Amino acid sequence: MSSSEAEVDISVVSSPEPSPLGAAARDSPLLARSPARSADGSSPPATPTHRSNTPNTAAGTPTTSASGGNHFHHSPSGGAVPPAVLHHHLQHHLSSLGSHPVALHHALHTFGHLHPAHGATHPALLQHALTPTGQQQQQQLQVQQQHQQSHVERLSPPMKSPERNGGDEVQGHSLNNNNSKALNHNNTCASAAAAAAAAAVAAANLSNNSNDSNGSSGGGGGKSTTGSNGFTSFSISSILSRSEPAKKNGAAGLITPIPQLPQPGAGGPQDAAMLSRLGFISQWGALAGRYAALCPPGWPWAPQRLPFHSPTHDSSSTNTTENPPSPTSMSPNNNNNNSNTTASSNQASKSPSHHPLHPLYHPLGSQQQQQQQQQHQQHPQQQQHPQQQQQQHPHQPTTPTSSSSSGGGSSLTHHPHPHLTGSHGGYLLPSSSNESDEEGEEIIEEDDGTDGPSDSSSPHGDGNSKRKKKTRTVFSRAQVFQLESTFDLKRYLSSSERAGLAASLRLTETQVKIWFQNRRNKWKRQLAAELEAANMANMAHAAQRLVRVPVLYHDGTTAGFVPPPPPHHHPMQYYAAARNTSPPRPPLSSLV
């Protein structure tokens, strides 16, 4: 075995971090049956000599490889991946990572991707690595036959997903995260459906602990080694530690995409591999944002290409879907604030009702969540602001409940409008309507008049003149009766009469003046309505009279015009007498 293969085998296994499953991980089915684990919990080191022809399988029974005396090396020009090498690599990862479901996928992706030409044999190789069959020669011949195209198609984008199509079966056994479910529904290749049973068997034997997001980075060790076949063996912790995409061997250092995503286009197929691997731990909002900061703006991070939107609206999926125009907006700063506000985002990705801070606003993006974090800091200021308004108007007996409702209403209605900050958040429509409803039953020096004094123009002292809040003064029946009686006597009051009436009714002069103004406006409206009704009645009556006017002459007569008769005679008598040539006509009343 060459040094490159040894480097690939040890890259993910030699991790200084403990397994996230702890001692309980030793009870998993594949690990219990794996004899390759040593006493100290580490995997056996990969020797630089030739591999034995009898590798240990997952069942623990040594089988004789059908490859004979052939030994496999990783040459720089690229070589085939034999079943024994794949199985041995899977043994390393399963023994070191504690049979985690993410560890199995990570082991498959880390050991090197089969290229698009190998799509038909990859499920068989996976089946051989878990349950050995007697078809190893046939699989090896197929791998060697397709090896000739491996160096050409090394960086080509993949066509289908051989191991992730069994996601619907995997959901029943190992609780996969939501973003991998969304990716499973997008891939509908018919030929890739044959690998569903093998992937289901592989994942059903694993422990049901895939929600632990530390499992995918527990075996990383922060090491990223580039093999000779054009793939990159990487760990999740290496993404967090690096500052830019590492390119060690030129074009061979590019990340080969794993075949499980729909084609994002020619904008960058190498990005799809990293994003799909991040799909395993999508509840890590900070990790996804860290990689998004490293992507150039032209790479496909838009939701119409990579639908990483989970149905439960977890925090990381909303970061990738709510801000599609700017890929740089998902910087680590945004996601750090997001992770601060959502302290338990791993639990929130499975049950959105257990969201710690804001269960009502799951579909909000990262910018609005930052705005919400600022809102919690500005909330005491907004509660103090209505109290300052009360100090400006001491004659208004505003209750403390109105200020609390104003502060609460501003904190709830502030999120759909993130551009409103400070004191403007308290002046949105729900909070203002709450205040007006509570203050509507109180006697305030203001009515709905148009020319009130300056002290009753508006309770807002910050210059917000767009919407003036009008409050209505409630008068008793005795006060209204006295005011109406005075208005029937005099439409306008002098200053002395207004002062005396206000003193007798226990009102202020301003309230009496505004009431008389409103009453005069109402009286004028009533007069205008009555005049309009009278005019309409007169016009209708005039129209009726125009219709009933009698015809005094005929168009075909040769005689001259006859003057109208005296009032005591019927007009038809003289009309018929003047026309001797025409026959007599009945009176007009019989015609009408």
From Swiss-Prot:
Official protein name in the record: Homeobox protein Hmx
A cellular component term, taken from the record's GO annotations: nucleus
Chain intervals with Basic and acidic residues compositional bias: 161-171
SUPFAM superfamilies according to UniProt: Homeodomain-like
CDD domains: homeodomain
General remark: When expressed in mice, Hmx is able to functionally replace both Hmx2 and Hmx3 mouse proteins.
Compositionally biased tracts (Low complexity): 52-70, 135-149, 173-183, 315-351, 358-405, 451-462
Recorded GO MF terms: DNA binding; DNA-binding transcription factor activity, RNA polymerase II-specific; RNA polymerase II transcription regulatory region sequence-specific DNA binding
GO BP, sorted A to Z: cell differentiation; negative regulation of DNA-templated transcription; nervous system development; regulation of transcription by RNA polymerase II
Keywords: Developmental protein, Differentiation, DNA-binding, Homeobox, Neurogenesis, Nucleus, Transcription, Transcription regulation
Disulfide bond positions: none
Similarity-based family: Belongs to the HMX homeobox family.
UniProt entry tagged with the keyword Aminoacyl-tRNA synthetase: no
